[in-house]
């Protein structure tokens, strides 16, 4: 055997070993009908397959096909599936620190979230925290600033929240609880029937595109803005940590690249689809309403109280919150000079025609 042939024979098993054939499962918190959220999962799995010449296959499952939508973290943590796609504020019952990595009232917007994770402390902090749950988390989508929810009565002042039963995700329910609202955590696909039957009085989900798909305009009249509890909602790819550590470095790099691509695509899709959906909702009779200044101020006060109370008893929460708040404060120095002043002028110019 010649030297070249011998080298090829030796190298072939090594290449095969570094690029093994794998079949993983990914369970999502979303129904397939929400094609932007679930679409991020499909984009991710397709990217991984194509980048590995089909050797690394990831099958995607919608909420309820393997586990309910709110049990994705459990399924990944205990190894029922290798991966999941979810919003971490669903898991505040385990530890409210999870919400800080997703969306909290008066927190970071979309670009600030991406910057905090990718160019500041965010990824390091979530690596430390998620490891205690046997998981690894990567950015994989952001909805942008969300809407403030669907109501069958007007919310003119803070007292109008009192006694309302509202489907609202994450830490916002804790905040509005201080104003007398009764928060309900319900998966996206179950919100419409709950509104229709009167099990809940109000609901928030994402924004115009997804809310239109779920039909909320048929069972609620008033659509409020902004969703101050979700200025930029980060969804994450959640990976079983031992499985992640077993992956070849090349596959880890591909997974990170695929998640990053899906992260950008999800935000772009929402930005492109929401304007048309908002127009259609209004044409169908939806009445847009802004939250009043008094409502916003009362909610900010309640949010600050929740953060102070939680930080006093939860060191992990305090550590992550302090990092996020310091980053946000510096960011808004810059945004006030550049982004905000530019966008404000352009919005006024548009109104003038």
What is each of the regions a protein language model found here?
Residues 2-8, 13-113, 121-353:
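N-terminal secretory/targeting leader peptides
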